[in-house]
């Protein structure tokens, strides 16, 4: 799966989790960029991403993610 395809799927997941069709995430998107992205929604988001891509994040990966670009790096490393 290409990086573009990962971001297409991530956009769908973010829109579903935050119930906002206007969201478009990019490499540098962080929780500060999305109004409703709090700690509870972060857990929901991670679970939805794991389900969408058929992966599991470990605690070290979760802690190291600083933005959506880093999330996509981890996803790509697990699916390719």
Per-range role (PLM):
Residues 2-37, 41-47, 51-80:
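Phosphopantetheine-dependent thiolation modules in NRPS/PKS and related acyl-activating systems
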């Amino acid at each position: 799966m290409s990086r573009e395809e990962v971001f297409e799927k991530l956009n769908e997941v973010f829109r579903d989790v935050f119930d906002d069709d206007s969201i478009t995430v990019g490499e540098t998107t962080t929780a500060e960029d999305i109004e409703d992205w709090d700690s509870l929604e972060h857990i929901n988001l991670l679970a939805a991403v794991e389900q969408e891509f058929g992966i599991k994040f470990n605690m070290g990966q979760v802690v190291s993610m600083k933005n959506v670009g880093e999330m996509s790096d981890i996803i790509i490393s697990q699916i390719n």
